[in-house]
Amino acid sequence: IEMCYASGIRLVTPDKLNPLYASSYGTGMLMKRSLDEGAKKIILGMGGSATVDGGMGILRALGIKFLTADEKEIIYPKELISLVTIDTSDIDKRLLECEVVVLCDVQNFLLGKEGAAAIFGPQKGATPEMVIALDQGLKNFSEVVSRSIGIDMATVSSGGTAGGAAAGLFAFIDAKLVNGIEYFLDLVDFDTAIKN
């Protein structure tokens, strides 16, 4: 599954890019469809996303609910600052029997000056003010996840890939994060081909 074709920059005209509202939900729907078709392994390419939602959209499509203090469901990245509770009771159980491999094109962490919002937010249409808001939202998301399931999304290498989606999938569905080009070179046994 190529995230750029489901939740990508290429799908939105530059004047319509707005990472405060852009969601990775469509990518999650494709993953769900793959599970419907019986997939036991999903390889997810994460380049070119229009999103900075920490993978919340993908995870929502797979059954996870993100809630405010008054139990209102969070839909947009701009609302992550209000996240208090994460309900995983309805997560798609088929994920337990499916290996998810995330092909990452960067090594950036989720937060801070080298994080998902600061480095990649501007190319997705974020103003400096939006970058601050998105980073604060992702920080809150990371803290709630750490308290809830004991995984620190902020320390995951390549977790900043695709607006933090890599970190979210690592935390909730035990996705394996790998270097995209290295994965494909291994897949085609490139080293052997070069020797021959």
Which stretches of residues belong to each language-model region?
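N-terminal loops that bind phosphate or other acidic moieties
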Residues: 1-46, 50-196
